[in-house]
Amino acid sequence: MADIKNLNPVEIWRNFDKLTQVPRPSGHLEKIQAYLLDWAKEAGVEAFQDPAGNIVMRKPATPGMENRKGVIMQAHMDMVPQKAPDSKHNFETDPIETIIDGDWVRANHTTLGSDDGLGVATIMAVMESKDLQHGPIEGLITADEETGMYGANDLPASELNGDILLNFDTEVWGEFVIGSAGGIDITATLDYKEVETDKEDAAVKVTLKGLKGGHSGIEINEGRANANKCMVRFVREAISELDARLASWQGGNMRNAIPFQAEVVLTLPKENIEALNDLVADWKDEICDEFEGIETTENIEFFAENVETPKMQVPAEIQDNLVDAIYACHDGVLRMAPSMPEIVETSSNLAIVEIGDGKAAIKILARSSHEYYKMYLATMVESCFNMAGMKVEFSGSYMGWNPNPKSDILEHVLKVYKEQNGTDGKVQAVHAGLECSIILSKYPNLDVVSFGPTLLSPHTANERCQISCVAPFWNLVKQLLTEIPAK
């Protein structure tokens, strides 16, 4: 494990190093919540955990600066638990192994947790600082952002006192985000009675892996391969041409990550095994050709292996309905923003497919900066799975964050950034969910901007943070806090 705690600036890297030692996958935050409260107590920082599981910290103003506008620094404590297929890492018990790789910090075949651990570490650095001059400060460290922004959604509307919100969950240094997409989770489920497999049939497990995956908002415009959408094309042809039957399907494991792996178990007449192997080879070539220049095609694996024939499988009619619905379900970009053609407005990610043992569950995350198109796409997906006889539920819906280009804090941030770096910052809206939109719905008078150091490939085992961006990011935060104007 690389010693990252002595990287510059040590104030941030020392705290991030501590965070990597505390397991904090979404949905399992007890250890990190306890750690943050213990850390605050030891540092002499006022802190409490609210009913939503968020940690709130408060630091009084430097004497003489009590009249300054209050600043809320915000980041989320949870991380996406993604790992390479051969990794044995247990996100609920194991620390993250960090590696310094040139100008980057990465993990050992797992997500790093810089999204949004570096934001949390920055809040900690400000809170423990003894020489930073500032007005009244609050730190809001939210729970379960990655799985549905639950901490922000359940944030009490009277908990915070600040006037300005600095969100540290943007992943390109020099970009200052003032708008983001809304989102909605769509879950389609079906219980079915399995039928017996023909005792004379053979069985194969077909696996697709080695795709890039990635963030289903930020990277959806790159046209990366979705393992579930690739697999369904193969499965439909195997059923149609080789009398294959579906026994089980497992593809994807995170609602907000493009699935990079999927596997199915198929049964079929023994005499069709050789033809199935040929079909697998053909589809591997097709996928590599289709995604040449987008995926790292030499990493793509698509193969079949003989397995014990399962006793039960999906009934033929239900199988056909499920496969058709997955095939037809929209995935990827639906519409670009008319006013900003380089920005995705509306998209969806066919994130998770789980079929087997008499149950089917399919999960999609739809995003849009336009509320109408968000619900239009969600209803389109709902209609698709309704036709397959599935029960469809919407959850976790949140509005987008409408840009305010005349924001006072944006103007100040851009001024300080140019003073420090000699170049203009880029004002941006992102096709991803940021908690800013939800917090603004509860605190509508906040002036908000989001920024952070450069991260690459978040939500994947290739996640990494650029070391050289962290020092200028820290310098910007410190000067901003020192120069916040009076109320």
Regions found by a protein language model. Give the residues of each.
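Midchain, well-structured core segments that form catalytic/ion-binding scaffolds
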Residues: 23, 103-106, 146-147, 153-367
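Short secondary-structure junctions
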Residues: 40-46, 237-245, 292-296, 343, ...
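His/Asp/Glu-rich mid-to-C-terminal helical/loop segments that flank catalytic regions of hydrolases
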Residues: 158, 223-241, 268-273, 320-327, ...
